[in-house]
């Protein structure tokens, strides 16, 4: 493979001898310890805005194609199989995977998706700015906010 004119801003460990490397146009999976070999390569045509890896899932957020859906979320497994392709109407600032769920947050709102792309929750969860969110299990989340810490539980 040629890596000329490519950016690789993020590499995640995916087990004892596997890695996920995010590039400006997609991601690649490498396996092996001494001389890792590329086993999967996924390329996207659209602009990738955010990426995350956890629980054997790769999540890419791309620029959407309309004002009604400013973003598009694609979910892949480590074999490169696309599991979901969802248009998003939620204006997010942060993407993370916690407790086997995809969390999109902005200043005061949270949007939760399953690792298969099904929306579980979307709404306001804070009166002040959310700085960090941590999954605590059983649909409970700890919010680190501008003015303190609070616990929320999603039904």
Predicted regions and their residues:
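Residue position within the beta-strands of beta-propeller blades
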Residues: 21, 60-61, 104, 142-143
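Repeated scaffold domains used in trafficking and secretory/extracellular systems
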Residues: 3-17, 42-56, 87-100, 127-140
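C-terminal structural cap/anchor segments
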Residues: 39, 49-95
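Short loop/turn segments that connect beta-strands within the blades of beta-propeller domains
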Residues: 15-16, 22-25, 54-55, 69, ...
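C-terminal soluble interaction/assembly domains
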Residues: 75, 93-98, 103-115, 119-134
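Structural motif
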Residues: 24-31, 67-74, 109-113, 148-155
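Blade-level signature of beta-propeller repeat domains, shared across WD40, Kelch, NHL, RCC1
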Residues: 120, 126-155
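A short beta-strand motif characteristic of beta-propeller blades
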Residues: 1-3, 35-42, 79-86, 118-124
């Amino acid at each position: 493979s040629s890596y000329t004119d490519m950016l690789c801003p993020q590499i995640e460990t995916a087990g004892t001898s596997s890695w996920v490397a995010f590039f400006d146009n997609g991601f690649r999976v490498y396996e092996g310890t001494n001389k890792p070999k590329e086993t999967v390569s996924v390329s996207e045509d659209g602009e990738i805005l955010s990426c995350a890896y956890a629980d054997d899932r790769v999540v890419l957020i791309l620029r959407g194609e309309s004002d009604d859906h400013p973003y598009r979320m694609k979910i892949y497994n480590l074999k490169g199989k696309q599991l979901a392709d969802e248009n998003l109407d939620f204006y997010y600032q942060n993407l993370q995977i916690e407790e086997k769920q995809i969390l999109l947050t902005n200043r005061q709102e949270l949007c939760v998706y399953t690792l298969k792309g099904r929306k579980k929750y979307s709404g306001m969860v804070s009166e002040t700015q959310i700085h960090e969110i941590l999954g605590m299990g059983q649909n409970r989340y700890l919010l680190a906010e501008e003015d303190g810490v609070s616990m929320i539980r999603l039904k």
